[in-house]
Amino acid sequence: PNSQEIRSVFAVHFLHQAFQRLARDPRLTQRVEQILGGGHYVHQSRINYKPGFKGKGFNWHSDFETWHAEDGMPAMHAVSASIILTDNHLFNGPLMLIPGSHKHFISCVGPTPKEHHKQSLKTQQIGVPSEHALTKMIDRYGIEAPTGPAGSLLLFDCNTLHGPNANMS
């Protein structure tokens, strides 16, 4: 929490043309529109950096719950897209998901304070579901950790409970 190390870079589709092109690439946008049933926009883009042996994970959360509490997103009509930048294995911090959890709205514990995003990337203690709710979802649906080669695309419902694991390599 007290480190000055950069963990995430936001709005990357505004920072570099390569990410701008990627955000508009039909191989991505057509799949998103197929899932959503129509048009789309980029609500948030970012790169999460998790160096070997040091890269920390994030707590379980739902993107929708965060976007709803912090940005005012009114409805769960969004898709989260994760493009793997390096080969992803079980040991180097893959995103873990609770498949099926998107069918349930799991509220975070307590209110989310204004400007919480500034602290949440250092240590995420607010804006996360209760251990009881997580246990219930994991017991019912299990945990998946998709892996794959660099360039692989993972699309998931914005309400899916997920959390990236630590990079142990």
Predicted stretch roles:
Residues P1-D71:
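Non-heme Fe(II)-dependent double-stranded beta-helix
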Residues I47-K54, F64-E65, I84-L90, G100-H104:
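Short acidic/polar capping segments at secondary-structure boundaries
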Residues N88-L161:
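Double-stranded beta-helix
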